[in-house]
C-alpha cells in the first residue's frame, strides 16, 4: 500500500499542490526518525531556556518567524541538515502541480468571476483532479495493481477536495480510478508525514515563483533533488497549458459566454 500526503502552498500569483508518496512501512520509519530528531532539538532548546517548537513549519523556519523567531540562520541550516539526513535514508517520491495564477486569470477570466461558490473552491477542486491524474501517471501506469491512499492537510476546502477525488476516481474515462482507495483529511498534530509534506510543498511553491520573480533555485531544494532517495515530478501549468485548457472548455461549450459560464464547485465546468 502506498500512502500519499498532500499539502498546498500559495500566494496571489502561484498556487502549488504537492504530494509525497511512499509505502506505509517507509512512512512508519520516516515518522519515527522525524520524531526523534524533533525531540532531540527540543531538549537542546529547553536546556538553553528557549522556546521549543511544536513542529517543523517550512515558511516559519525559512523566514525565522513565530517559533523560529529567535533562531540564527546557522541554527536554521543545521536543523535542515538534520532533516535532510532523514530524507536521505528513506525513499520518497513527490508529485507536484503549480499554476501561474496571473496567467490563469488573464487567459480564463471567466473562472475568477463566475466560479461557484468562489474561485478558491474551484481552484482546489480542479488542482485535486489534476494532481490525482499525475500521481496515476507516475505510479499506476507502471503498476496498474498499485493501491494508493491519500491524506490531505486539513483545511476549509476538505469537502470540495473530497468531492473532486470521488468524481475523478469514479470517472469511467479515468483508467486508474481503481488504484485510489481513500482520501481523508487530518492535522499535522496527529500526522508527522504532513510536516515533510509541508516542507516540499513550500519548496515547490518557491521554485514555481521563480517564473514570477526570477532568481536562483533555493539551495534547500537543490539539496533535496540531489538525494538519490528523493525523486519525483513537478509541473507548472503555464500559459500554454492554460490556453489548451481554455480551448477544451470552449470546445465543450462550457464557457461560450460570460452569461453561460457556470463552473461547478468541484473544479469542473458542466458540459451542455
Report the location of each language-model feature.
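Phosphate-ester processing/binding pockets and catalytic centers
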Residues: 1-4, 8-272
